[in-house]
Structure formats: C-alpha cells, structure tokens
Amino acid sequence: MPSTQLRQTRLTQAKHVVVKIGTQLLIGKDGQMQLDYIQHIADQIAELAQRKVQITVVSSGAVGAGLVELNLPKRPKDVAKLQAIAAVGQRKLMTCFHDAFEKHDMEVGQLLLTRSDLDDRLRYLNFRNCIAQTHRFGCVPIINENDSVAVDEIRFGDNDMLAALACNALRADALIILSGIDGLLDHDNLRVDLLKHAK
C-alpha cells in the first residue's frame, strides 16, 4: 500500500490525534499573530470533535507571541530574557486559542510541561489523567513547553520532541506536525514520507 494511502487510512480510523503547531505558522513573517490560521485550526478541530475524534494540541509560539506583545524586533539570546518573553507570550497565545475555540462554544485547557514531567512516573500519570479528564469535559487540551523554567528546551526546541513524547504517553493514534519546514529528514538528509518507528 502506498505511504499516502496508508497515512489516510490510519488518520481516518484515528480516535485520538496529537497535533503539533509550529511557531512559523502561528507568527507570520510580519511578526504578527496569524489569527486567521489559528481560527482555521480551531474550525477543523471543532469539526473533528463533532465526529468524536479527540485532539490534543501541542503548540509552540510562546516566545514568538511574547516578542509581538512586547514589541521586540528580534529574539534575544539571553535565557532570562527569553523566559520572561515566553511568560508574557504564553498568555497571548492562549488568548488567541481561547477566542478561536469560543466561536464553537468550546473551552481550552492549558498544560505547561517540561520533558522531565514525562520522565517522572507520578507526573506522567497525572499528565495522562489530566488530558483524559480535559477531553471528558469536552475541552481541547493545549500543551506547551514550560519555557519559563525549561532552560535547555528554550534554547534548542520547537516542541517536536515534546509532541512525540506526549503522543506516546497518551497512546494517541497519530501525531500530526504542522510546520513551516519541508518535512522530517533521515540521517542521509532525505525526506521521510512515512515514519513507522521513532527511537
């Protein structure tokens, strides 16, 4: 079966999907929040919710949104500044998601994590239970890295690893990465069409 057809079959049968949204899609080249795009995502998730598909969102963009809110022209390198910018931006990001989902009478729930939260057994179980209950309430859980305390992640990540870990922890049926990047590359720098296994 061709990889495109296999992908479509798996997605059609999925009951719980983790969707990761990259910063480049949330913050435009003009440096402004892409409210139309966020609304488009909310519209699609609302439609899937009508079909009883659970969607858990992993969103990047706190630093980018903070730069917008604070009218800063470029991303600083200083970690303390980045953490403060992320703290401001996270509120803006969640406001944008809230406003988009409110048009569908849906609530959103915010979960801020670090990778170590999923390494600790008790916090891992608490995370899974919280996501499950958020879905039972009919809300959309929105996960972001806790950039205000996650020093390594704020320097190197855009939540791709967090999305993969969350997908595994939640035993979701699929992980969809929405990104401005052309795709995942293997060790030979060739684009991967279908990822069957990740280590």
Describe every region a protein language model picked out.
Residues 1-199:
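Nucleotide/pyrophosphate-binding catalytic subdomain
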